[in-house]
């Protein structure tokens, strides 16, 4: 996912509390960030089902986006952590695998 995003000129902020920062950089060239660094997002991709991410409500996810009311909030729920009903009610544009 990260490599594909970079081909489009997107520089993702990657958060993975379980991964080793050193290993992520050495093996994949990916710098890991804390959740606090993941602010002002255009899009959020939940790609792993770690408990830290399962614990996030959709309201918590919404706080990660840019604060402008005009910006569309896009969520990719790769692991299907959220119900389709909750996603529809959230007002975010979403894709779910």
Q: What are the residue ranges of the model-derived segments?
A:
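Structural/interface elements that position substrates and couple domains in central-metabolism enzymes
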Residues: 1-97
